[in-house]
């Protein structure tokens, strides 16, 4: 049995590229209980907490848990609270390079592997009108950093250095290699 410990539709779609048959079992944890640390450590800790929470219920299953966050100049960006919060995030990221981190936790045959994948993303310089036009698409609400690279958010991006799918939410090639080990 293979379990994805995430309810993210993007992670589910990406995992299908690597695993044919899996179940979705979101972890029931309070993410706010995880102290803010360095971005890579933060996402790794959250992925571990999610994976371990599901492993208690399914100790013999293969379980994949992941968490993604955006970091810019030492600040972690999660999902925006509202449109104004999303506007501020995008304004701050405009013309800048930020980092997207995904922590991965995989339990297979009772053994645990953990990895953190980092991708650098550079935004174009965005006008107020461009930001407002993007926000009008209403795809920002459930996305860290207030954008989705796989949707209209692609128009905001000048350059990606690293794994594109990491920015979507699941670094597929890294997951495939972890599963081979």
Swiss-Prot record:
Instruction: Give one GO term, molecular function aspect.
Output: dTTP diphosphatase activity
- Annotated site (Important for substrate specificity), which positions? 10, 68, 150
Which cofactors does this protein require? a divalent metal cation
Keywords (alphabetical) are: Cytoplasm, Hydrolase, Nucleotide metabolism
Pfam families listed in its UniProt record? Maf
InterPro entries assigned: ITPase-like_fam, Maf-like
Recorded hits in Gene3D superfamilies, A to Z, give: 3.90.950.10
What are its GO biological-process terms? Answer: nucleotide metabolic process
Q: Which terms in the GO cellular component ontology are assigned?
A: cytoplasm
List of catalytic residues: 67 (proton acceptor)
Q: Which reaction does it catalyse?
A: dTTP + H2O = dTMP + diphosphate + H(+); UTP + H2O = UMP + diphosphate + H(+)
Q: What is its EC number?
A: 3.6.1.9
Question: Where in the cell is the protein located?
Answer: Cytoplasm
Similarity field: Belongs to the Maf family. YhdE subfamily.
Please give the function described in this protein's UniProt entry: Nucleoside triphosphate pyrophosphatase that hydrolyzes dTTP and UTP. May have a dual role in cell division arrest and in preventing the incorporation of modified nucleotides into cellular nucleic acids.
Q: Which HAMAP family match?
A: Maf
- The protein, known as: dTTP/UTP pyrophosphatase
């Amino acid at each position: 049995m293979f379990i994805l410990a995430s309810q993210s539709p993007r992670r589910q779609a990406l995992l299908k590229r690597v695993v044919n048959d899996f179940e979705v079992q979101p972890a029931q944890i309070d993410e706010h209980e995880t102290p803010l640390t360095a971005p890579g450590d933060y996402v790794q800790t959250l992925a571990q907490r999610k994976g371990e929470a599901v492993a208690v219920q399914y100790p013999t299953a293969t379980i994949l848990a992941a968490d993604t966050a955006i970091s810019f100049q030492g600040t972690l960006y999660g999902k925006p609270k509202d449109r104004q919060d999303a506007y501020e995030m995008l304004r701050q990221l405009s013309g800048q390079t930020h980092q997207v981190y995904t922590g991965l936790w995989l339990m297979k045959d009772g053994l645990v592997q953990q990895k953190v994948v980092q991708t650098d993303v550079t935004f174009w310089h965005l006008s107020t009108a461009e930001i407002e036009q993007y926000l009008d698409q209403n795809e920002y609400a459930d996305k860290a950093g207030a954008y989705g690279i796989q949707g209209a958010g692609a128009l905001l991006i000048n350059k990606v250095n690293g794994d594109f799918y990491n920015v979507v939410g699941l670094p597929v090639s890294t997951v495939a290699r972890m599963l081979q080990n």
